[in-house]
A protein has these predicted regions:
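N-terminal small-domain helix-loop-helix segment of the aminotransferase-like
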Residues: 2-106, 304-308, 410
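Conserved glycine-rich beta-strand-loop-beta hairpin in the small C-terminal domain of fold type I
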Residues: 298, 302, 317-328, 338-350, ...
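PLP-dependent enzyme catalytic core of the Aspartate aminotransferase-like
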Residues: 87, 91, 95, 354, ...
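A short helix->loop->beta-strand "cap" motif at the edges of active sites that frequently abuts
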Residues: 123, 206-210, 237-238
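Helix C-cap/helix->beta junction micro-motif
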Residues: 31, 206-207, 334, 368
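Conserved core of the PLP fold type I
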Residues: 65-204, 218-233
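Conserved core segment of the aminotransferase class I/II
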Residues: 149, 232-318, 325, 329, ...
Length: 410
């Protein structure tokens, strides 16, 4: 009989959000007349903007004509989108990229999970705690995480982020090969300054580490002093891979498109000590395992960068951030300690009286019919917190805050 990859058996039986869905469904069955408002899973609610819809319709029409039909596209992505990415997302910030450093994908989740394939299985990893579960789970699958004991993986360096340090992780006192950073942060909604980010780049240069930088929420940054890209830091091209997504930027959760930057200067070593550029390695991996993002999705993404597209996408982002600002203010009125929600669509809320995350989740669900995400699902340091998202309708966010206030007796 064929042997299974036993590393998969180390994973928890349920993905965090699948577990939440089961609990919510059980509640709905028991309370069929009660409308549940979800501020948990971070899916968007607003429709695609008109510029994107127009571009998609045009692309569909092109697929209906033999002269303009498109089959397999280039694995890295079409030039029209990669050039638009460089021109709009990087050049205005003084970052110069070559088109061959841009890899279009079907959403950041794919590449953040798959990028570890091009690095040896015995590299050690460092993660902020709390953290987006995919970063660790994808490393568990390859055998890099070790053994799960007392809520932690034995071969993972956890870098706790809490209120005492504004949720900014401390630089490790030992060498870490692969470092996962996400800013604006999911789940805490906090950001990192250029000064703090520079410390990480310098650490990576000194220790020959690689930073895997998830910038999926950079479009929500409003503070001009906060970096949108790690490549705003001198030297980062030598040590960092950056991931971007259109899911929350432009509502592409159902369209699927994003991109990854792999600089040509970025290198890793063989066991013999030979330096090897990772850009062609990732390109080779993509050519083998990925047939490219759909033409229709890439035309949709290109439309985001038109004058009309920029204006419309910004309006949607502002819609969600209005929710975030409102929710933050209302929760603070209730005496809760709230973080995030200023440069990110996530709010990280301290539970009253240090109530365990899952217990508070259950109490809020049954007491207010409002769904949150238990902070402990993002790591040990998330215990005693919940995450709320601002991706709902204005009316739902308002009603959810009213329900929570009534439930808490405020």
């Amino acid at each position: 009989m064929a042997l299974v990859n036993e590393h998969f058996l180390k994973l928890a039986n349920n993905y965090l959000f699948a577990d939440i869905a089961k609990k919510v469904n059980a509640y709905k069955i028991a309370h069929p007349k009660q409308r549940v408002i979800s501020l948990g899973i971070g899916d968007v609610t607003q429709p695609l903007c008109p510029a994107v819809i127009k571009a998609m319709h045009k692309a569909v029409d092109e697929m209906a004509e033999q002269a303009s039909f498109r089959g397999y596209g280039p694995e890295r992505g079409y030039d029209f989108l990669r050039e638009a990415i460089i021109k709009n997302d990087f050049l205005p910030r003084g970052i110069h990229l070559d088109a061959n450093e841009v890899f279009v994908n079907d959403g950041a989740k794919s590449d953040t999970g798959n990028i570890q394939e091009i690095l040896r299985w015995d590299n050690n990893i460092g993660v902020t705690d709390p953290i987006y579960p995919v970063y660790i789970d994808s490393n568990v699958m390859i055998g890099r995480a070790g053994v799960f004991e007392n809520g932690k993986w034995s071969n993972v360096t956890y870098m706790p982020c809490d209120e005492s340090d504004d949720f900014i992780p401390q630089i490790p006192d030992h060498r870490v090969d692969m470092i996962y950073l996400c800013y604006p942060n999911n789940p805490t909604g906090t950001v990192i300054s250029k000064e703090e980010l520079r410390k990480w780049v310098n650490y990576a240069i000194k220790n020959e580490s690689i930073i895997l930088y998830d910038a999926a929420y950079e479009a929500y940054i409003t503070d001009p002093s906060i970096p949108h890209s790690i490549y705003e830091i001198r030297g980062a091209r030598k040590v960092a891979i950056e991931f971007h997504s259109y899911s929350k930027t432009a509502g592409f959760t159902g369209v699927r498109c994003g991109y990854t930057i792999v600089p040509k200067e970025l290198k890793a070593k063989t066991l013999a000590g030979e330096e090897v550029a990772l850009n062609p390695i990732w390109d080779r991996r993509q050519c083998t395992k990925f047939n490219g993002t759909s033409y229709i999705s890439q035309r949709a993404a290109e439309a985001i960068y038109t004058p009309e597209g920029k204006k419309q996408v910004k309006a949607t982002i502002n819609y969600y951030m209005e929710n975030a600002h409102f929710m933050r203010a209302e929760l603070q009125k209730l005496g809760l300690r709230v973080y995030g929600g200023e440069n990110a669509p996530y709010l990280w809320v301290k539970t009253p009286n240090n109530t365990p995350s899952w217990k508070f989740f259950e109490e809020m669900l049954y007491g207010a019919s409002v769904v949150c995400t238990p902070g402990v699902g993002f790591g040990p340091s998330g215990e005693g917190y919940i995450r709320l998202t601002a991706f709902g309708e204005h009316e739902d966010c308002k009603e959810a805050m009213e329900r929570i206030a009534k439930w808490l007796g405020k």
